[in-house]
Amino acid sequence: QAEAHKGAQKAVDKLMARIDEMIAEMPDYLTGEEKMAIARNNLEMEKALKIKKGKPMDVDKADKQNANPKHVEEYILDSKGIYRDKRGNRYRKNSDYDKKRDTPYSINCQTCAPAYALRLRGWDITAKGNVAGSKLEYLSNGRAFEVWKNTDGTPAQHISINSWLAHKGYLKMTPKRYMEYFNEVCKEEGVYELCIGWKSGGGHATILQRFADGELRYIEPQSDNSAGSGMEWKDVKYLCEIGAATSHNCRGVLRIDNKLFDVSFLDIFDT
């Protein structure tokens, strides 16, 4: 019996050491309660995924399309290309693009955004493609935030664009109001998931990140817009310009770096 007790104590000590190790890796701006809850969530994810969480990744390793490596652009930048966007950038058709194969990886933003956030924590996971009948298709119908929980396990609630408009006494969004909204709801250092509707119709789930120096950056995990990608003009100002004037209640912002991931949605990732 004493031996069994000793073995059990050893297992508990090992578990606590693992939790302490994970907590030590986390950003200082998270609270003690948040760190402990995330560490326990990591253990739950390790058990479900049957892989070990690695060391936290920096922004470059988590981003630069590493969260969605199977994404292929239909058009690629080419100064002599015959296609142009509204900004005058020239493109040519990508000969490597295959519509049937590649479309699922251009409509999977609802997994790219959490994949980026979890990669920052040290999870070497990537986004699956969005195909009919998948959990990803379920999330893409206005349910993107359902993958996140508060530290007490309750469903996380986003700050909807509509509730912010009502609070401000505004009737609709404008580019200036989008900037005001982003700066108000993404005030603290951290990682935020944004669900936004486009002026042209449709919508998108993506990332806004507030850094220690005060910068608010639009990070696009689905298709690279980082410095040097040629697409860095897709910035926060760009989001403000193409955001819809009116939105469904599912549109808004949720801080996610201090949230728990619902393990029932882990099959939206490849490992």
Residue ranges and their predicted role:
Residues G169, P175-T271:
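Active-site or metal-binding loop neighborhoods of secreted/extracellular toxin and effector enzymes
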Residues Q1-V12, I19:
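Long amphipathic alpha-helices with heptad-repeat character
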